[in-house]
C-alpha cells in the first residue's frame, strides 16, 4: 500500500465523498479517514455507525485505503466541556467552530501526518488561496452553503496543509456529480444540527447535563409576569419557538420573542416586537480575536461582519484593543447579537478571522449587567 499524499476526512456524507472522488480524479495518492467524535450513548440518535459504513463504501468504490480514529475523548475535552460551561453561564456557544479548531484541523491533521500524508482535505464549502507567502481562507463559491464562518479560527500552518476540493462547486452540481459517478451517498440527506444531539429534543439532551429549574418570564418594560419558562438555559436571544406563551390578558395575540435572560435570577425576558429595541445593538466587544494572517490588517479598519451563520454581511468598523479583543461598531443597529456566538470578519470573499462575542450595548443586556460595562471601560 502506497503512502497517501492527501488524507480526506470522510464523514459518510455526500460532500466529503465528492471531495475524495475529485482528488482521485486529479491523480492524487488519497486515503480516507473517518473520525468518531462522539461516543455512542445508547440513544441511537447520533448515527456514527451508519456514517462509518457509508464512508467505508465510498472508499471501497474509489479504491482508496480507509482509516478510522476515535477522537471522542478529545472532542469531550476540547469542545463539549466548553459547550456546557457556556450554556451554564447563559451564553450560546458555537461547537462547530471549536470542533474545527480542536479536532478536525488539529487531531485529524496530526493523525494524517502520522499515517504519512502531507496534507488533509475535507468536504467544507470554502476555498484556500495563496497570495505571496500568505495563505487565505475564502468563502465557498456556493454562498448559500459557504462554511468559512465555521473555519475562521484556522491559521497559516493549517491552511497550508489543507485542501477544500468542493469549494468551487454549487451544491446542485455536487449532487449531480455524485449521482453520475454512482457514489453510494449521492442521495443521502445533508446532516443538520449538532452530532451529539442528533434528532433528540434539545431541552431533553441539555437537561441531562445542566439540570434546569422553572422560572418567570417577564416583560422588561414594566416587570409584569407573562408566563413561566422550563429553564433559561434552553433559550437564546431572538428565539420565538418553544416559549409556549398562550393568551396574555391585555396583550395582543401576537408572537413573543426572547430579548434577554438573567441566569443569576433565573428570569427570561420577552417582547412581542420581533425587532425589539431591548435587543438591538450598535456595538459589540469580543474576546481575544484570532487573525488568519497572524495579525490584523490595521489597528482600525472597515470591513463586513457576520454575527451568526448565514447572516447577510453587515458593514462595520473594527478597532483592535490592547488586550487583543476588538470593538466593533456597526453601520446600523443589529438584532439579537448573542454573547457566546462567533463574530467573523470579511474583506470581500476573504475571511480575516474572528472572535467570540463577549458583550453588546443592547439596552437590556446593559441593564442586567452586574459588572462594569466594557464600553464604559473603553471610554474611560
Curated annotation (Swiss-Prot):
Region (Interaction with tRNA): 145-147, 308-309
Active site: 99, 195
Localization in the cell: Cytoplasm
Domain of life: Bacteria
GO cellular component: cytoplasm
Molecular function via GO: ATP binding; tRNA binding; tRNA-uridine 2-sulfurtransferase activity
Catalysed reactions listed for this entry: S-sulfanyl-L-cysteinyl-[protein] + uridine(34) in tRNA + AH2 + ATP = 2-thiouridine(34) in tRNA + L-cysteinyl-[protein] + A + AMP + diphosphate + H(+)
EC number: 2.8.1.13
PANTHER family: MITOCHONDRIAL TRNA-SPECIFIC 2-THIOURIDYLASE 1, TRNA 5-METHYLAMINOMETHYL-2-THIOURIDYLATE -METHYLTRANSFERASE
Protein family: Belongs to the MnmA/TRMU family.
This protein's name: tRNA-specific 2-thiouridylase MnmA
Organism: Stenotrophomonas maltophilia (strain R551-3)
Amino acid at each position: 500500500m502506497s503512502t497517501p499524499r492527501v488524507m480526506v476526512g470522510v464523514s459518510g456524507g455526500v460532500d466529503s465523498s465528492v471531495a475524495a472522488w475529485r482528488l482521485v480524479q486529479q491523480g492524487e495518492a488519497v486515503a480516507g479517514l473517518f473520525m468518531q467524535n462522539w461516543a455512542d450513548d445508547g440513544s441511537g440518535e447520533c448515527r456514527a455507525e451508519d456514517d462509518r459504513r457509508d464512508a467505508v463504501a465510498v472508499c471501497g468504490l474509489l479504491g482508496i485505503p480507509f482509516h478510522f480514529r476515535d477522537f471522542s475523548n478529545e472532542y469531550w475535552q476540547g469542545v463539549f466541556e466548553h459547550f456546557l460551561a457556556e450554556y451554564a453561564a447563559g451564553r450560546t456557544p458555537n461547537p462547530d467552530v471549536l470542533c474545527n479548531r480542536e479536532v478536525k484541523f488539529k487531531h485529524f491533521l496530526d493523525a494524517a501526518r502520522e499515517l504519512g500524508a502531507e496534507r488533509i482535505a475535507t468536504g467544507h464549502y470554502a476555498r484556500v488561496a495563496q497570495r505571496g507567502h500568505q495563505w487565505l481562507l475564502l468563502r465557498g463559491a456556493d454562498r448559500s452553503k459557504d462554511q468559512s464562518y465555521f473555519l475562521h479560527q484556522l491559521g497559516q500552518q493549517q491552511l497550508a496543509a489543507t485542501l477544500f476540493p468542493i469549494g468551487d462547486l454549487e451544491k446542485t452540481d455536487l449532487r449531480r456529480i455524485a449521482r453520475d459517478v454512482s457514489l453510494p451517498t449521492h442521495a443521502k440527506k445533508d446532516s443538520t444540527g449538532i452530532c451529539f444531539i442528533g434528532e433528540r429534543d434539545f431541552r431533553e439532551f441539555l437537561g441531562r447535563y445542566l439540570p434546569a429549574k422553572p422560572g418567570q418570564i417577564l416583560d422588561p418594560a414594566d416587570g409584569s409576569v407573562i408566563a413561566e419558562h422550563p429553564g433559561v438555559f434552553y433559550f437564546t436571544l431572538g428565539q420565538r419557538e418553544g416559549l409556549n406563551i398562550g393568551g396574555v390578558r391585555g396583550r395582543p395575540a401576537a408572537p413573543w420573542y426572547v430579548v434577554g435572560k438573567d441566569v443569576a435570577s433565573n428570569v427570561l425576558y420577552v417582547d412581542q416586537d420581533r425587532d425589539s429595541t431591548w435587543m438591538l445593538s450598535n456595538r459589540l466587544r469580543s474576546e481575544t480575536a484570532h487573525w488568519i494572517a497572524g495579525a490584523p490588517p490595521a489597528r482600525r479598519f472597515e470591513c463586513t461582519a457576520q454575527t451568526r451563520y448565514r447572516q447577510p454581511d453587515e458593514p462595520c468598523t473594527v478597532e483592535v484593543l490592547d488586550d487583543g479583543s476588538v470593538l466593533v461598531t456597526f453601520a446600523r443597529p443589529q438584532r439579537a447579537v448573542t454573547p457566546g456566538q462567533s463574530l467573523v470578519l470579511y474583506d470581500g470573499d476573504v475571511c480575516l478571522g474572528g472572535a467570540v462575542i463577549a458583550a453588546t450595548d443592547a439596552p437590556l443586556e446593559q441593564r442586567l449587567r452586574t459588572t462594569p460595562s466594557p464600553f464604559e471601560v473603553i471610554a474611560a
